[in-house]
UniProtKB/Swiss-Prot annotation:
Belongs to the WD repeat HIR1 family. SMART domains: WD40 (SM00320). This is Protein HIR1. Keywords: Chromatin regulator, Nucleus, Repeat, Repressor, Transcription, Transcription regulation, WD repeat. The lineage of its organism: Eukaryota, Fungi, Dikarya, Ascomycota, Saccharomycotina. GO terms for biological process: negative regulation of chromatin organization; negative regulation of transcription by RNA polymerase II; negative regulation of transcription by RNA polymerase III; nucleosome assembly; transcription elongation by RNA polymerase II. GO terms for cellular component: chromatin; chromosome, centromeric region; HIR complex; nucleus. WD repeats lie at residues 15-54, 72-111, 129-168, 171-210, 224-267, 292-336, 340-381. It comes from Candida glabrata (strain ATCC 2001 / BCRC 20586 / JCM 3761 / NBRC 0622 / NRRL Y-65 / CBS 138). InterPro entries: CAF1B_HIR1_beta-prop (IPR055410), HIR1-like (IPR031120), HIRA-like_C (IPR011494), HIRA_B_motif (IPR019015), WD40/YVTN_repeat-like_dom_sf (IPR015943), WD40_repeat_dom_sf (IPR036322), WD40_rpt (IPR001680).
Length: 840
């Protein structure tokens, strides 16, 4: 091992050496980035540093200069991190700005007055979200997520592809100074001066959602608050987290947190002052088991010779200016470098091979620790790390993401070739025939093989047609329609059908390759397979009532009885694009599922939001940090502020809701009248100026009726389904749920007026074609009529309907015209609503 320190390997400018706060090595191990008090990010060549450390003669003096020096920050650079895919470099500063850098492959001349730089890095994104210094940055192992933490107590999650802000957590009560990702891509952990470490679990099925898995307090109860950073590290096998600035009694230590149980049974004790940083070596090592005696028996030596186990190595450093290397097989450090720097150590970084360790300090020095081959142990291949992570459901392919446009083009080209190959192979035989009749089909296919004929040969009678005539199940063609005689599956013939194979002989005598018409295999063999009397959808009976459309469903249920007229009509409704056929329904949007959905925001609307099919403008409040509701007149004005504690993506996480409940604040005439906390996510709200109450609907189907002074007027109402819009009229409250049901209550009398009135009869009253449900209209608005205590609905197609409770149905409201003819009077009398509703 060698400890190397170069005088030029620092942030030196105008006879001053600046403190260095951060260091990181690129995934390919060729570059190392540093940042410090001078506000610059410097990129150095690792190969040049290794060559200089080896003392090679003839080394160019230009190698003593950084490859690039970027100065876009207006404050000190506190953290830099390369993305695991190597495409980006993220940097954070005390100017509260997060910059995303990318290397420009084009050659650019150096600016006036600057030294010639070998690389040019440009800012691709400038992200502003923190309210104070950014202290640490970490990327997900697949580069899909970026997390930043800072002195504003916030944890901000960014999209690693487009760098949009996904979520902001303000769960810590003090400065957040460290963050690290799980190598298995399941968790990330943060360390804060509130003397806690929080483990966040994230799910990437569809929309990314986050939950707080565990809050760890015990190792940090007496943790000092004097460190600049709390840079923690996760072991490469995913089993342990090393957290600096912990305590074990009165002694400073580094806590080792076990995965899953999240307890701390191991502490690394040895530093005289609080530690700032801990870094696991990215490689796992094999080491021989120590022999107890030097003169042991040969049998014992043979047994222990091949007995190897995996070990991980961790480096710790901090304010005592010392560096310690620990290994999992020993209780004491294997190496300690005292006073390796003159001031506190701020950051460390291993290269991907695990044989070089970079250490930065406040004395503006950068120290390199270079280890010889197998000095730390025998490193296992990098694939061995993935094998260790398999226990957590991780494989190498789970980290594969499109890295560039060229990769997407190559994948598209491969997919096109694959389709062509499948199309050419499908002309020989069908996969279903092979599965049903493997032996008989092999015999028959030999007789159906078609080879190119000579120009002198004639095409007369084909063998498959003769076989077809010999079949017991004859195909009878009558009036241009085909019929298949019903046959039991036990007595079905074994000859393969060739009705879909057409061969055309050209004038030159050559035979064109048979063209296999692309049909549904189930249609072809439906005569042989038993089917239920009522067609059951492939996705289940529940899809019949949910209105879920499945492409090709009609063709599946019509069976094999398809004639030329049906084929012509089907072909007229098909549009060919890139070799595939799409029906008229394929060009429309998919149907909406009538199920509860966890996303109810206007800005994140998806096709499976059921309420969108019913109502044009919903009453769902926005998924923002604070929503303001207003009610009343100018003289008597009321406001209600709603602060949901969690986002809609985790609205059903009870633990997160109890940790961060929804806060409700009410104001009247400049005074706060309401302050309440509800462990539910509020999605809709409305106020009544007459009865002076607020109606708040939650994501789990509850409705809270609270007065303007915060009292709960009636027990909360449980509908079991989300409310998408509320309307207040006098003392009455009318709501529409996501399943299209109306409910109405008289809040003053505390009784129900309307319940379970479905909107579907007037929405889905158009003729249904086949098995598809098509909704082309929605509700423009609805209102409550106080005189008759009923509901009136106005659709977007300028038609209005009224609910008649005594009839138990809807009635369309016709416009009244002046009576001129007797026939018109008769028509109006027949179509109008009964006399007691004539006021409408």
């Amino acid at each position: 091992m060698r400890i190397v320190k170069f005088p030029w390997f620092s942030h030196h400018e105008e006879s001053r050496d600046y403190e260095i706060y951060t260091v990181d090595v690129s995934p390919d191990g060729k570059r190392v980035a540093t940042g410090g008090l001078d506000g610059k990010i410097r990129i150095w060549s690792v190969d040049a540093l290794v060559s200089a450390a080896a003392g090679e003669s003839g080394v160019d003096r230009d190698t003593h200069r950084p490859l690039a020096s970027m100065s876009r920050h207006t404050g000190s650079v506190t953290c830099v991190k390369f993305s695991p895919d190597g495409n980006y470099l993220a940097s954070g500063s005390d100017d509260r700005i997060l910059l995303i850098w990318a290397m420009d492959e084009e050659n650019h001349g150096g600016s006036f007055g600057s030294e010639g730089e070998k690389e040019h890095w440009t800012v691709r994104k400038r992200l502003v979200a923190h309210d104070n210094d950014i202290q640490d940055i970490c990327w997900a192992p697949d580069s899909s997520i970026l997390v930043t933490v800072g002195l504003d107590r916030s944890v901000i999650v960014w999209n690693g592809l487009n760098f949009e802000r996904l979520k902001r957590f303000d769960v810590h009560q003090s400065l957040v100074k460290g963050v690290i990702f799980d190598p298995a891509n399941k968790y990330f952990a943060t360390a804060s001066d509130d003397r806690t470490m929080r483990v966040f679990r994230y799910h990437k099925t569809g929309e990314v959602s986050f939950t707080i898995e565990q809050v760890i307090v015990e190792p940090f109860i007496a943790s000092p608050l004097t460190t600049y950073f709390r840079r923690l590290s996760w072991s490469p096998d995913g089993q342990h987290i090393a957290v600096p600035n912990a305590t074990n009694g009165p002694v400073s230590s580094v806590a080792i947190i076990n995965r899953g149980t999240w307890d701390s049974s191991i502490s690394l004790i040895g530093h005289d002052a609080p530690t700032e940083v801990a870094r696991f070596n990215p490689r796992l090592f094999k080491s021989d088991v120590e022999k107890k005696a030097k003169n042991a028996k040969d049998e014992l030596s043979k047994d222990t010779k091949n007995n190897k186990k995996l070990e991980s190595i961790i480096a710790t450093a901090g304010q005592d200016k010392s560096l310690a290397l620990w290994i999992t097989s020993r209780p004491r450090p294997i190496f300690v470098a005292y006073d390796i720097a003159q001031k506190s150590i701020t950051d460390m970084a291993w290269n991907p091979n695990g044989n070089i360790l970079f250490v930065t300090s406040l004395d503006s020095s950068i120290v390199m620790l270079m280890f010889d081959a197998n000095e730390l142990g025998m490193p296992i291949p990098i694939e061995g790390n993935m094998e260790q992570l398999h226990r957590y459901g991780v494989d190498k392919d789970s980290f594969d993401l499109p890295e560039s446009v060229n990769q997407l083009l190559l994948e598209d080209k491969y997919g096109t070739k694959k389709k062509q190959h499948e199309l050419s192979s499908s002309t020989q035989s069908t996969a279903l025939e092979r599965r049903l009749e493997p032996n008989q089909f092999q015999k028959k296919i030999n007789s159906r093989e078609i080879s190119p004929l000579k120009s002198t040969e004639k095409v007369n009678i084909l063998i498959p047609k003769r076989k077809k005539d010999m079949k017991m199940n004859k195909v009878i063609v009558k009036d241009g329609k085909k019929r298949v005689a019903p046959t039991l599956i036990s007595t079905a013939g074994l000859q393969p059908t060739v009705t879909n194979v057409k061969e055309v002989a050209s004038s030159s005598g050559k035979v064109v390759k048979p063209v296999l018409k692309k049909t549904n295999d189930i249609n072809e063999y439906s005569g042989r397979l038993s089917t239920p009397s009522i067609p059951i959808p492939r996705l289940g009976i529940h899809t019949l009532v949910m209105g879920l459309k499945e492409r090709g469903k009609d063709k599946f249920e019509r069976g094999a009885e398809v004639g030329p007229d049906d084929e012509l009509r089907e072909a007229s409704n098909q549009i060919t694009f890139d070799g595939e056929s799409y029906g008229q329904d394929s060009l429309m949007k998919d149907e909406y599922r009538m199920t509860l959905n966890n996303r109810l925001t206007k800005e994140k609307v998806s096709s499976n939001e059921p309420y969108l099919r019913y109502i044009e403008n919903t009453g769902v409040i926005a998924d923002t940090d604070a929503v303001l509701l207003e009610c009343g007149s100018i003289d008597d004005f009321f406001t209600l502020e709603i602060r949901n504690g969690v986002e809609r993506a985790i609205q059903f996480d009870s633990d997160a809701l109890f940790d961060n409940p929804t806060r409700i604040l009410g104001y009247h005439e400049g005074q706060r009248t309401i302050e309440a906390f509800i462990p539910n996510v509020i999605i809709s709200g409305v106020g009544s100026p007459v009865s002076k109450y607020w109606s708040l609907a939650t994501a789990d189907g509850f409705i809270y009726i609270i007065s303007y002074n915060g009292q709960l007027l009636i027990p909360k109402i449980n509908l079991g389904q989300k409310v998408v819009k509320q309307v207040v009229c006098s003392n009455y409250l009318l709501v529409l749920t996501e399943r299209g049901l109306f409910y109405a209550w008289d809040i003053s009398a505390k009784r129900s007026v309307i319940k379970n009135v479905s909107i579907l009869p007037i929405i889905n009253n158009d003729p249904v074609e086949g098995n598809r449900v098509r909704v082309n209209k929605s509700i423009r608005k609805f209102e409550f009529e106080v005189s008759e205590k009923t509901v009136i609905v106005h659709l977007t197609n300028n038609r209005s309907f009224k609910w008649l409770a005594y009839f138990g149905c809807w009635s369309e409201i016709q416009e009244l015209v002046a009576p001129r003819e007797t026939v018109a009077n008769i028509l109006l009398t027949e179509n109008e609503i009964p006399p007691q509703s004539s006021s409408i």
